[in-house]
Swiss-Prot record:
GO terms for molecular function: rRNA binding; structural constituent of ribosome. Keywords: Ribonucleoprotein, Ribosomal protein, RNA-binding, rRNA-binding. Belongs to the universal ribosomal protein uS19 family. This is Small ribosomal subunit protein uS19. GO terms for cellular component: cytoplasm; small ribosomal subunit. It comes from Pseudomonas syringae pv. tomato (strain ATCC BAA-871 / DC3000). It holds the Pfam family Ribosomal_S19. PROSITE patterns: RIBOSOMAL_S19.
Amino acid sequence: MPRSLKKGPFIDLHLLKKIEVAAEKNDRKPVKTWSRRSMILPQMVGLTIAVHNGRQHVPVLVSEDMVGHKLGEFAGTRTYRGHVADKKAKR
């Protein structure tokens, strides 16, 4: 279920402060965050945000199409290595 419009989008305050500082300085370095639950706001467009996936920080370049989605959607947490082939099926 989506969040109520009355409440507005959720974003962690520490992440919002980092984004405001990066936007003021026009800093090209990625903004590191562990907050996968924060929503992408229009102020983030054009910034690179390094989202933690449980093991490392994945750089995500924010575009206009991503506004309204959560940061965690763009940094996968699981690696898919494919299904193991059965020896009998190869014959």
